Amino acid sequence: MAVARHGCPPWGSILGLLVLALAAAAAWDVSFLRCSLGSFCECDFWPDLPGLECDLARHLAGQHLAKALVVKSLKAFVQDPAPSKPLVLSLHGWTGTGKSYVSSLLAQYLFRGGLRSPHVHHFSPIIHFPHPSHTEQYKNELKSWVQGNLTACGRSLFLFDEMDKLPPGLMEVLKPFLGPSWVVYGTNYRKAIFIFIRWLLAVWHHGGAAAGCCGPLPPPPAASCAPLCAQ
């Protein structure tokens, strides 16, 4: 009859596991510290530019110049620890060329929550600004919304869809946030990203101005497809 023998505990294995656990904890602490002190982990901001570049190359047919400009602008902005201006991107062109698709990819690869991130704010003229007669009210609401969210998190993304359908005048309240000043209304906004879709007289790069729009605020996620041009 075989007798089962209980050997000594495998201390080598236990010590090995303990070392691995301590190493993992130390790595987590370093990562957490880097996220706490650095700019890359602010407010759900977790940019994956290689992933974005790969996805654009695989799924956005044509638009090579536009893709290159988007990636180049984002790289320069994200890698700058203290940008002098917010990043302003204007995606414009005919329906079906990828504007909305690109904007949804930007949110997906810049924020861990994508379009559902509390720091990604998507505005639609039909949903948020439906009544041109309420433009003055919309101006006050939009200014307060942008200012409040930038105060809570400088790494915020503001996406304005269908700019051509916005009543004139609303976007004027954004001009102070798009310029070279360091602080607006007591808020540091230089790490923010503004994306304007389907606005023909667009400006592309750090800084710019917009015009025309209206509506109430909380941000609904959404995305579709349209043409992309860079200027």
From Swiss-Prot:
<comment type="similarity">
    <text>Belongs to the ClpA/ClpB family. Torsin subfamily.</text>
</comment>
<keyword id="KW-0067">ATP-binding</keyword>
<dbReference type="InterPro" id="IPR010448">
    <property type="entry name" value="Torsin"/>
</dbReference>
<feature type="binding site">
    <location>
        <begin position="93"/>
        <end position="100"/>
    </location>
    <ligand>
        <name>ATP</name>
    </ligand>
</feature>
<comment type="function">
    <text>Salusin may be a endocrine and/or paracrine factor able to increase intracellular calcium concentrations and induce cell mitogenesis. Salusin may also be a potent hypotensive peptide.</text>
</comment>
<dbReference type="GO" id="GO:0010628">
    <property type="term" value="P:positive regulation of gene expression"/>
</dbReference>
<keyword id="KW-0372">Hormone</keyword>
<dbReference type="GO" id="GO:0005788">
    <property type="term" value="C:endoplasmic reticulum lumen"/>
</dbReference>
<dbReference type="GO" id="GO:0016887">
    <property type="term" value="F:ATP hydrolysis activity"/>
</dbReference>
<keyword id="KW-0732">Signal</keyword>
<feature type="signal peptide">
    <location>
        <begin position="1"/>
        <end position="27"/>
    </location>
</feature>
<dbReference type="GO" id="GO:0005635">
    <property type="term" value="C:nuclear envelope"/>
</dbReference>
<dbReference type="GO" id="GO:0005524">
    <property type="term" value="F:ATP binding"/>
</dbReference>
<dbReference type="GO" id="GO:0042802">
    <property type="term" value="F:identical protein binding"/>
</dbReference>
<dbReference type="GO" id="GO:1904427">
    <property type="term" value="P:positive regulation of calcium ion transmembrane transport"/>
</dbReference>
<feature type="propeptide">
    <location>
        <begin position="28"/>
        <end position="189"/>
    </location>
</feature>
<dbReference type="Pfam" id="PF06309">
    <property type="entry name" value="Torsin"/>
</dbReference>
<dbReference type="InterPro" id="IPR027417">
    <property type="entry name" value="P-loop_NTPase"/>
</dbReference>
<keyword id="KW-0547">Nucleotide-binding</keyword>
<keyword id="KW-0964">Secreted</keyword>
<dbReference type="GO" id="GO:0005576">
    <property type="term" value="C:extracellular region"/>
</dbReference>
<protein>
    <recommendedName>
        <fullName>Prosalusin</fullName>
    </recommendedName>
</protein>
<dbReference type="GO" id="GO:0005179">
    <property type="term" value="F:hormone activity"/>
</dbReference>
<feature type="glycosylation site" description="N-linked (GlcNAc...) asparagine">
    <location>
        <position position="149"/>
    </location>
</feature>
<keyword id="KW-0325">Glycoprotein</keyword>
